[in-house]
């Protein structure tokens, strides 16, 4: 079922002229994230082998259609942080058909560096979601949500409108420019405490503030000598 659905997706994308499909991969080992009960040696490795066995045939179809798949690094998926992203890419032999959808909101509550991630995986950033999160760790809550609903003030973190959280957006946009990213930048809006018709336009305006034009010449070129 997975192969058939994703193969149809690749063909449909190609028919519409879409060159990048964003989505999730699933994971047969996410339930082992706590590593307890103790994980049998080789079980994690087998999970990445299972991922490759499922996805390489799918990516063959994507290759044939001239379409790329951008996996969103996200809890519950095969790649959910820095090192699991390395492992997922290695499992597929770093084939170009498989890249990443960068969504820094999922980095914030894990204390991952989104800017360093962009640099280290710069050849795999196929799409960017501008989505925001904010931590509220107070010694009584944690990172796993405590089975509390979105927007509950007792949570340790929550999604908020872009510009109201902990993502260093200026650094993100500067790094995107540094790595030569020229793909889509999409505002993905989620905030349990704000009306979307207010929040989404405001988020777009805030993010556009950081999308400034690059310089046409080095700022210190005038001091270089040689030209009058």
Q: What are the functions of these language-model segments?
A:
Residues 1-100:
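Active-site acidic/histidine proton-transfer and metal-coordination neighborhood
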Residues 19, 56-57, 64, 79-102, ...:
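Histidine-acidic metal/acid-base catalytic patches
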């Amino acid at each position: 079922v997975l192969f058939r659905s994703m193969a149809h997706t690749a063909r449909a994308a190609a028919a519409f002229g879409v060159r990048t499909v964003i989505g999730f991969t699933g994971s047969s080992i996410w339930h082992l994230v706590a590593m307890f009960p103790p994980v049998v040696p080789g079980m994690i490795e087998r999970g990445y082998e299972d991922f490759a066995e499922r996805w390489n045939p799918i990516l063959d179809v994507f290759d044939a259609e001239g379409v790329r798949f951008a996996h969103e690094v996200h809890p519950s998926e095969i790649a959910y942080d820095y090192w699991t992203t390395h492992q997922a890419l290695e499992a597929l032999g770093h084939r170009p058909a498989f890249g990443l959808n960068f969504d820094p909101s999922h980095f914030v509550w894990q204390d991952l560096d989104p800017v360093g991630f962009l640099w280290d995986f710069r050849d795999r950033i196929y799409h960017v979601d501008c989505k925001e999160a904010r931590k509220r760790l107070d010694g009584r809550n944690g990172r796993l949500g405590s089975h509390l609903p979105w927007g509950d003030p007792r949570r340790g973190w929550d999604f908020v409108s872009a510009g109201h959280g902990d993502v260093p957006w200026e650094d993100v946009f500067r790094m995107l420019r540094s790595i030569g990213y020229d793909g889509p930048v999409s505002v993905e809006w989620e905030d349990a405490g704000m009306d979307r018709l207010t929040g989404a336009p405001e988020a777009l305006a805030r993010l556009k503030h950081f999308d400034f034009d690059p310089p046409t010449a080095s700022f210190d070129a005038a001091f270089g000598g040689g030209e009058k």
